[in-house]
Amino acid sequence: MAPCQGRPKIVIQTSSAYILLGYLEILRQIVLPPQRNLPQMTLPLSRCQTLPVAAVVCTVKHSSVLLNLNILPALLSDLNRLPNQYAHIFNVLVCFQTFILLQ
């Protein structure tokens, strides 16, 4: 995780990070060719911890995930239509998108 040092610390709940990475994993399976055998994204953290978005970004990068910023807004739009109990996912993804765009 050394490349993440010195980056802004936008803290999100770990449970939200798991959900975020779950959606990114789905995105990975859709976007990448099926013959690409890339590692699964995992976060070895307890649910009571918080996680900087920088760590999420590094987890994604280290998993060789190709995150296309042109696809992310459509994903945000889909998440925005989810029931209210999932509304925090949308907020997490907005923070995540903002963080990536600042890189």
From Swiss-Prot:
Source domain of life: Eukaryota
Other observations noted: Partially overlaps SLM3.
Protein name (record): Putative uncharacterized protein YDL032w
The organism of origin for this protein: Saccharomyces cerevisiae (strain ATCC 204508 / S288c)
